[in-house]
């Protein structure tokens, strides 16, 4: 069937901020859909609240709304867009299948509330009936029964009484799955009545439709997924089979997964394939991709259907990257009427999309967790997803892919080789948790049988035998020295996936250049080097036109280097807190810009969720770990073509930055800011000296390499002090210490340090305003992109603070000083590309906190606010072009990039709901997973919109509970008065209430948790409180504070932990009380700015 000509405009709903359970994979799928539909000539409108995405770039859609993803805001966008359509235009369609669960839920809300009918909007990609049939647990169960497929025995529960009754019939354990939630939120396994009551209560609260599916436990069964596509002509193909290494009971997002499935016989696979095709047809997904999950009982082969996603999912992104088949792009084209046989495969340019992909390699995905960021969080894994990112690796065998995947995670952790107590290993094997794979390896290394490990873990014996072979190779290698190992044995170890670093560790090799370099040189001397194979969807049956490559130790190379001038861009690896999608955004922009400038762009990354690992983002994609060995091999392979080559390290965050000096030492041309300058900014003593020479103030500070030195220096500097390790991103292991005892505890427990990696100790500036500055520099000229004022005070990690552009109340003198210091620093550090500077302003004095001569996480946000693609310009500066080519007027006038008449507020999004035991207080260690942006012509409204987009809806009436620490109590009355003036009642604990009453404020007193009843937690649970302002007492949260903040999360009450954010909330609430808010299309804002501000013409940029 040809494309639909009856449609003229298509609205795509994005997935919003990065959260656990819904990550960068939806930027990848949304961006593909936008490009595909624009190329087909449709008018594309995008709604998404996340400024850090490629899909929200103004060129990806005709109009882009960075607005809160709520039914109210979407209705306003639909109203405006419908009104803009000329008479006689085609239909207005909504595509809800590329924005994850968020978009699907919103589409259902808009349909059920009548909004779609009101504005004559049609759904494409998935019809309402199909969405409901797949998402509603009861309808899905009935549909499976109709086609004769088995499902777990289950019941849909709306109250505690029915839940207990069902448990009496079926017995424990029971699996709980709340309806319409994300990443298994609220899910769990109940082993007894008490756990059932607790989990069921929480699950009912979290489900938007107040329902939870209780089902029989299939713990320990094998789990599989099939990724399918269907078109309007009822052609159905299976793109990829995926097998979970971990058995049922662990959320698939927290499980190691393998593609294609390894332990199914051909007959079993065909039965599962036929069942999946029956499912997609019965549910009624007319077009696009679907993911169907199965479980099989290893004892008797019983197969059951677990669930189906009638949309592009996390597994779709993995299947896309595993096969090279662009699922989201093809799903978008199917949604507008094409059939699979009418779409050509971009990779082969010969085969149609109805050819099922064939794999002649193995793909392994391993999740990345960060429980160390959340002390007190339960690290066991279950039906609720907890990982923050993932790495993917490709090899010719499972063993090779697994070993490459493990080193792609960059954990740097390994269990010691010496024996661990048997009872500890047993405990670690029985319960799924992030380090279980290491304990499995450890058990096998120390003689445990595969049968024993299988009985404890229920991991399939086939996988365990593979791990046993790795363990045996490990043990054998450890018994020899490097000189005793011949070329054949070394080649076998490399084929198994052992890295040079791992081999050097096993051989205890020592060398001045570094042990792994010694192994590298031994390999090369024996001619043992990787070759590069192509991911081509057809197992090399047809020629591939998109070089999507992976390394292996075989004979034939499929990726001869070209003779074009080229740039290698090092990506950021798996998403993690502190190094997320913002850095991938910068890598993509570098690839787009340099490709336009005639360079062959080469991307190196191992993250399957991202746009950077899409087959058409760069000219060549190496899906490889970001380690010295892997990058060096790629560089030498590409350089052998003889063409000019450069390597960019400053866009991918800390991961590639850590490689800058070793690469340069090996003769690799690192372009942009030199590795020496990067190192100078990171080296505390040398950087302090530079600031003194430039006459730029900094908080008093020093370094320490021992506990005694740390205590002496902290006492000398004066408390409070900020302590942190050197060379980290995301505020890893940072702490504000208010007394000597806290410094001692930090040095003993929190951090590893050495002569090379000292601990940094700075005086902490209390009641200071923090400011972030992003700028562009070519080594001579410098232009500031944005001076962002933090809404949280200094001491809260910059990634966890809301910030506003332009600044709200910084004086002209402070702004002038910031510009002067920024220009001085850019010149002194010889920055070529991007630089980020963090300042603290205390009583009008400007201090430098730190300088990062690289891309920062705020670059996408500043680019969206100003309309200037900073990362694209930075990439071009690194290849030798000058800033005057792009921003001549800004240089002449000394002007920052302009933001027009609007305020842009960026707010963080936190995973507190996934870690209910964790305190929500903010500090110098970053804990947010994503971000949103609010845009308005006044600060209050922009802040309110950002808070709403982040899931923290500010109330417009009701009662505010205020409890302030000793330092903040003096401001209690003034703050309370602002809320009283807005019509709120005030509740406070006795100490804060005294201050308020002294200031003439009427206040209701309430007990602290340990003082009596009813206390503040009782009021929260009784829905008496609409907002909480609770500033922490010190480094260690008091029992009362934690209880309050935890109760607030459960009740989903907005909670603010700093005075400055409370003041911003007052402005936000006032704006909401004034009435209707406005929505803005990014393209219109940028057009108005360029017309109204001649000082910002961006030359020569697409």
From Swiss-Prot:
Function comment: Large subunit of the glutamine-dependent carbamoyl phosphate synthetase (CPSase). CPSase catalyzes the formation of carbamoyl phosphate from the ammonia moiety of glutamine, carbonate, and phosphate donated by ATP, constituting the first step of 2 biosynthetic pathways, one leading to arginine and/or urea and the other to pyrimidine nucleotides.
Single GO MF annotation: ATP binding
Catalytic reaction(s) noted: hydrogencarbonate + L-glutamine + 2 ATP + H2O = carbamoyl phosphate + L-glutamate + 2 ADP + phosphate + 2 H(+)
InterPro entries, per database record: ATP-grasp, ATP_grasp_subdomain_1, CarbamoylP_synth_lsu, CarbamoylP_synth_lsu_oligo, CarbamoylP_synth_lsu_oligo_sf, CbamoylP_synth_lsu-like_ATP-bd, CbamoylP_synth_lsu_CPSase_dom, MGS-like_dom
Gene Ontology annotations of biological process type: 'de novo' UMP biosynthetic process; glutamine metabolic process; L-arginine biosynthetic process
Binding site for Mn(2+) 1: 293, 307
Name this polypeptide is given: Carbamoyl phosphate synthase large chain
Organism: Koribacter versatilis (strain Ellin345)
Residues reported in the UniProt entry to bind ATP 2: 724, 763, 765, 770, 795-798, 838, 850
Cofactor (UniProt): Mg(2+); Mn(2+)
Subunit relationships: Composed of two chains; the small (or glutamine) chain promotes the hydrolysis of glutamine to ammonia, which is used by the large (or ammonia) chain to synthesize carbamoyl phosphate. Tetramer of heterodimers (alpha,beta)4.
């Amino acid at each position: 069937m040809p494309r639909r000509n009856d449609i003229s405009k298509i609205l795509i709903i994005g997935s919003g901020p990065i959260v656990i359970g819904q990550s960068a994979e939806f930027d990848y799928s949304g961006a593909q859909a936008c490009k595909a539909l624009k190329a087909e000539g449709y008018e594309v409108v995008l709604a998404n609240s996340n400024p850090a995405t490629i899909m929200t770039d103004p060129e990806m859609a005709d109009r882009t709304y960075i607005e809160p993803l709520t039914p109210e805001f979407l209705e306003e966008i639909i109203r405006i867009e419908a009104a803009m359509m000329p008479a006689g235009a085609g239909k207005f369609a909504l595509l809800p299948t590329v924005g994850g669960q968020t978009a699907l839920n919103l589409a259902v809300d808009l349909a059920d509330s009548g909004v779609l009918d009101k504005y004559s909007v049609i759904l494409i990609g998935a019809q309402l009936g199909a969405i409901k049939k797949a998402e509603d647990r009861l309808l899905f169960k009935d549909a499976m029964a109709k086609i004769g497929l088995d499902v777990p025995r289950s019941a849909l529960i709306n109250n505690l009484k029915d839940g207990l009754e069902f448990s009496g019939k079926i017995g424990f354990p029971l699996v709980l799955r709340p309806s319409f939630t994300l990443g298994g939120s609220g899910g769990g396994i109940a082993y007894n009545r008490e756990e059932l009551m607790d989990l069921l209560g929480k699950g009912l609260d979290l489900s938007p439709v107040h329902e939870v599916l209780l089902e029989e436990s299939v713990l320990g069964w094998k789990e599989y997924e099939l990724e399918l596509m269907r078109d309007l002509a009822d052609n159905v193909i299976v793109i990829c089979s995926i097998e979970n290494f971990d058995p049922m009971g662990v959320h698939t997002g927290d499980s190691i997964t393998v593609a294609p499935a390894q332990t199914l016989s051909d007959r079993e696979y065909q039965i599962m394939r036929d069942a999946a095709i029956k499912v997609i047809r019965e549910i009624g997904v007319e077009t696009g991709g679907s993911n169907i999950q199965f479980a099989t009982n290893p004892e008797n082969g019983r197969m059951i259907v677990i669930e189906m996603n009638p949309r592009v999912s996390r597994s779709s992104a993995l299947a896309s990257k595993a096969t090279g088949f662009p699922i989201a792009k093809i799903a978008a084209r199917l949604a507008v009427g094409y059939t699979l046989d009418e779409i050509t495969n971009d990779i082969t340019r010969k085969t149609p999309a109805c050819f099922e992909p064939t794999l002649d390699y193995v793909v392994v995905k391993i999740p990345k967790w960060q429980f160390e960021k959340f002390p007190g969080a339960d690290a066991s894994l279950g039906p609720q997803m907890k990982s923050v990112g993932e790495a993917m690796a490709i090899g010719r065998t499972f063993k090779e892919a697994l070993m490459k995947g493990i080193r792609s995670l960059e954990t740097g952790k390994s269990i010691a080789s010496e024996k661990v107590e048997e009872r500890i290993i047993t405990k670690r094997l029985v319960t799924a948790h992030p380090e279980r794979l290491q304990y499995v390896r450890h058990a096998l290394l120390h003689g445990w049988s595969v049968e024993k490990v299988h009985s404890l873990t229920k991991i399939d014996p086939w996988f365990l035998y593979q791990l046993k072979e790795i363990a045996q190779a490990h043990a054998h290698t450890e018994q020899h020295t490097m000189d005793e190992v011949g070329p054949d044995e070394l080649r076998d170890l490399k084929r198994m996936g052992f890295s040079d670093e791992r081999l050097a560790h096993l051989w205890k090799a020592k060398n001045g250049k570094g042990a792994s370099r010694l192994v590298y040189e031994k390999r090369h001397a024996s001619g043992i080097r990787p070759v590069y194979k192509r991911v081509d969807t057809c197992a090399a049956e047809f020629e591939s036109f998109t070089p999507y490559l992976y390394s292996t130790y075989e004979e034939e190379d499929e990726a001869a280097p070209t003779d074009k001038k080229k740039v290698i861009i090092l990506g950021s690896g798996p998403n993690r807190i502190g190094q997320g999608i913002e850095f991938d955004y910068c890598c993509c922009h570098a690839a787009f810009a340099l490709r336009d400038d005639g360079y062959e762009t080469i991307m190196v990354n191992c993250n399957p969720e991202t746009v950077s690992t899409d087959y058409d983002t760069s000219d060549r994609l190496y899906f490889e770990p970001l380690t010295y060995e892997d990058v060096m091999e790629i560089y030498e392979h590409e350089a052998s073509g003889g063409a000019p080559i450069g390597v960019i390290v400053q866009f991918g965050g800390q991961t590639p930055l850590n490689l800058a000096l070793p690469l340069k030492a090996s003769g690799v041309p690192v372009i942009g800011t030199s590795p020496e300058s990067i190192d100078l900014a990171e080296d505390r003593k040398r950087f302090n000296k530079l600031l003194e020479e430039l006459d730029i103030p900094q908080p008093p500070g020093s370094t320490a390499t021992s506990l005694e030195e740390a205590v002496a220096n902290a006492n000398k500097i004066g408390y409070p002090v900020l302590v942190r390790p050197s060379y980290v991103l995301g505020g890893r292991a940072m702490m504000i210490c208010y007394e000597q005892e806290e410094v001692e505890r930090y040095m003993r427990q929190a951090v590893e340090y050495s002569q090379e990696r000292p601990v940094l100790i700075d005086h902490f500036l209390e009641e200071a305003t923090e400011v972030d500055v992003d700028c562009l520099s070519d080594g001579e000229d410098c232009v500031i992109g944005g001076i962002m004022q933090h809404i949280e005070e200094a001491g809260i990690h910059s990634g966890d603070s809301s910030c506003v552009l332009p600044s709200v109340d910084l004086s002209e003198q402070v702004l002038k000083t910031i510009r002067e210091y920024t220009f001085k620093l850019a010149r002194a550090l010889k920055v070529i590309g991007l630089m980020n500077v963090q300042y603290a302003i205390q009583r009008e004095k400007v201090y430098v906190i730190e300088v990062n001569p690289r891309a920062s996480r705020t670059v996408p946000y500043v680019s969206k606010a100003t309309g200037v693609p900073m990362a694209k310009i930075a990439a071009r500066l690194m290849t030798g072009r000058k800033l005057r080519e792009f921003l001549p007027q800004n240089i002449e006038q000394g002007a920052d990039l302009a933001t027009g008449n609007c305020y842009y507020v960026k707010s963080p999004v936190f995973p507190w709901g996934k870690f209910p035991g964790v305190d929500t207080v903010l500090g110098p260690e970053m804990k947010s997973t994503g971000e949103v942006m609010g845009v308005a012509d006044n600060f209050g409204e922009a802040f309110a919109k950002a808070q709403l987009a982040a899931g923290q809806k500010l109330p417009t009436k009701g009662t505010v509970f205020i409890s302030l620490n000793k330092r903040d109590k003096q401001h209690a009355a003034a703050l309370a008065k602002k809320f009283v003036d807005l019509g709120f009642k005030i509740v406070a604990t006795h100490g804060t209430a005294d201050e308020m009453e002294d200031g003439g404020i009427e206040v209701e007193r309430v007990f602290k948790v340990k003082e009596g009843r009813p206390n503040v937690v009782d009021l929260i649970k009784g829905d008496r409180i609409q907002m909480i302002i609770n500033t922490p007492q010190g480094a260690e949260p008091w029992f009362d504070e934690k209880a309050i903040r935890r109760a607030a999360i459960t009740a989903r009450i907005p909670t603010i932990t700093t005075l400055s954010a409370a003041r911003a909330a007052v402005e936000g609430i006032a704006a909401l009380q004034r009435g209707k808010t406005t929505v803005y299309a990014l393209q219109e804002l940028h057009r108005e700015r360029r017309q109204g501000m001649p000082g910002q013409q961006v030359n020569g940029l697409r």
